[in-house]
């Protein structure tokens, strides 16, 4: 089931809506078996996404969100309102103390973001 849906914007009718799903996958480094935030880079998370069919899952979640918004949001337009998906690999997120010390405030380890493939979602909506 979908973990979380959030609107990003000032007003609900103008917001982009995002699906958030958290994962507890263990991604170890090539030279060790430790589970460290550095192991949760884009390439490793992409590989994990494909391995576990998460792109398919994200499409199904976005289709469900698309149908909900079409039903509930007046003047819904997928290209304006459907944002995409965020996968949070919990074991890859940096410790808050490290984040507070960071000058760049980079929290990208453990965060995998994708835009909604609008044409594909519309096609799936018509398909079934």
Question: Can you describe what each PLM-predicted range is?
Answer:
Residues 1-128:
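Structural signature of nuclease core domains in nucleic-acid processing machines
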